[in-house]
Structures are given as C-alpha cells and as structure tokens.
UniProtKB/Swiss-Prot annotation:
GO CC aspect terms: endoplasmic reticulum membrane
Enzyme Commission identifier(s): 2.5.1.148, 2.5.1.21
Phenotype when changing S276Y: Loss of lycopaoctaene synthase activity
Name of protein: Lycopaoctaene synthase
GO MF annotation terms: metal ion binding; squalene synthase [NAD(P)H] activity
Binding-site positions, Mg(2+): D76, E79, D80
Amino acid sequence: MKYTDFLAHPDEIIPTIRMMYADYRLKNMEIKDPSVRFCYNMLNRVSRSFAMVIQQLPVELRDATCVFYLILRALDTVEDDMAIPKEVKIPMLRTFHEHLSDRSWKIKCGYGPYVDLMDNYPLVTDVYLRFDEGTKAVIKDITRRMGNGMADFIDLDEVLTIPQYDLYCHYVAGLCGIGMCKLFVDSGLEKEDLVAEEDLANQMGLFLQKNNIVRDYLEDINELPAPRMFWPKEIWGNYAKQLDEFKDPKNLDKAMLCLNHMVTDALRHCEVGLRSLSLLHNPNILRAVLIPQVMGVRTLTLVYNNPEVFRGVVKMRRGETAKIFVTTTSKLSFFRTYLQFANEMEQKCLTEAKNDPMVALTLKRVQGVQAACRAAIVKAEIAEGAKGPSTAMVLAGALLIAALAYFAYVYSAGGTSLKALPLFGVVIILAIGLFGRNLALKTV
C-alpha cells in the first residue's frame, strides 16, 4: 500500500482504517474447532478479499461458503499445477469430487499457501462432512461438473474460439455462482426463482472470470514449466501469430488492440448479469454478491487500454477496495458506484482509445450498462424514498441542531472562537459525528 495515495484520495483513509480493523478481527477470530479454524485461516491466506466478502453473508451460510470455496480452490490448484503430467491430471480432476467423503485423502501439489491447503485438505473434508445432505450434494455436484469441465480443456493446448472461452469460464466460475445460488435458496433465505434463472448467475461468474483472465495475462503466459493460455485465438489471432508476442514491448500497439478487444468481450456479460440482482432479497446475501461485481467492473475499467497489463500487475488501490467494501451497502449505492466506473470507461473510449477499431462496440456495451444502471438507480431511489428518511439522515439532523444549540450557548457565554470552546465539548461533538458517519456507512 502506498501511503502517498491517501494524499490524492483522502476519502479512502477512514474506509482503509475500518477495513484494517475488520481484517484484524477476522484474523483473530476465536474458533475452537481446529478444522474450522484451519479453513478460515487458509481462506484468509488464499483470498483476503473473499474472506471479507464471506463475512457479509448471514452466519448460517458462512461455513458452507468458506468450505465450498476452499474445495474449488483445491480443484483449481490441481488444474493450475503445470508440473502434473496430463495423464495424471485429467483423471484426478474427473474424480476429485469422489474424495469428498474420504477424510484421509490429500495430494502434494501447488505453490505457496496452496501447498498447505493440499497438505491439510483432510481438515477441509472434515468440516464438509458435517454439513446437511442438501449442502453436501450441492457442493459435490458443482465440484464434479467443474472438475470434468476442467479436464475437457486440459487436452487443448489453447482456447480457440469465443464459445470455447465462454464454456471454460462457465466451468471454472459460472458453476460456482450457480452453486452459491442453490445454497442461498436451500438455506431458506432466498426464493426459488433465483435457482430457476441459472443463466443470470452464470453470466455474473463469466464476467468476474474474464476480468481475472484479462488482468493476469503476463502471469499466465510466464507460468513455468508451461504457459497457461486462456485468451481465445479467435480474438488474439487477429493481432499476433503467437499469444506470447504481446509481452514483447515492440508489439505493444498490437497488444493494446487485443487487450481492448478482450475487455469488449467481457463487457457483454455485464448488462445481463446485472438483471440477477433483482432476484436477491436478503440484504446480507445481496451485499456479498454486490461487492465482487463492483470490484469486477472497476478492474475492467483499470485494465482497459492500459499497457501495464503487459508489464506487470494491474490492481485496485487498497484504499479504493476498502471504500467499495464500506460504501456498497445497498442496490442504490451499488448502481451509483457501478455507473461511476462505467462513466470512467466511457471517457477512456472517447479520449485515449478513440482510435481503437473496437471502440464503437465497446461504447455500445458501456452505454448499455450505463442505461441499465440509471434505470436501476431511479427504481432504487423511489424504493428508498418510500421508506422515509433513513436513521443516518435523522441522526445527521439531530447532530446539526445539537451543534447549533451548543455553539449558540458558547457564543452567549462570551466565546468568540474555537479556542473558547471547552475541550470536552469539541471531543463530544467529534465523537458523535464519527459515530453518525459510522452508522451511515454501516459496519463492514
């Protein structure tokens, strides 16, 4: 984290402090059960952002979601380990789900924290086996489908067509969204129509996965002992003979054209995916779904027409991430932020990328997202208005009246400046003000 970022973005200071505190609490949760404790500690190691997202969910969904995520990450670790021979990896992926009932099964593979995940996988299995039959069935079914889908793509040296690209993203991300929707419904916290609209959950998953694939070009192409190539040849073949040509600085112009083409492809999932939000009713589930989506569109805005994709890592500022977590509390706040980032991408299209041959289609898709957001904002504002003034607004009014009364009292007593204010009065006013801000933003 660059502390100088706060000079340019002071509005991110308080959200960052709140996120740091929430992260501290998360790391220091008192969990007596060793298997459950391992799962949450491992989750925090492999994905701090998703660990925070899970904490937004209702309590009864957190353990299942945590274990579901770790099982799929373990499956993904097998797929990603390029040192495992194909003849070993393919059957391993196809039978991975069968080991969910075996408390002793584990395998050595992966790197970094994933080595620990695979070495201690029996602890994940132990928690999984305690779930009710319905939860276990959902997790096992998605793991089976995902593993078989991954195996189908192992024999392909590269993704050739856009439909293949969509199918791969469905297997590795869309299925996860579909499974989560089933868990939401099975818990009784969401309605059956959420499961009936599988394609909407799938589209949201495709959008997030394509964000990662576009952003991680350099990491994937430099993977040893063999590169991982997920960009479809149907797109990159228009700009190069080999996918790895884009990492060569002399090919940057072509690389940028391909990058913008990839972003434009990812945008086609936005507008459809946004429609699924109308099917979510539980506020905690809604927030857990909203946060990754708004972070996804922000990432897409950052990578669009950005040469740094081919030089290193492009990611959001930590303060910006914190601000999204803190302020994304409702559909209204979500659509306002989503629209803000869509507007930023539109500006990129109209200025720095105006000569890109794909820009007309990019603009069309961005403007479709903008229109969907504006319509949703109007609808959400009407709904919020019908509820009457919020607690935060009432408190803000009360604070204003109290502050005016206090200053009037000090003035009548002969005070002429802040120096005349009793120190305890200043402290009280500031403390109440901070409490009001905290209530308005809601707890992370």
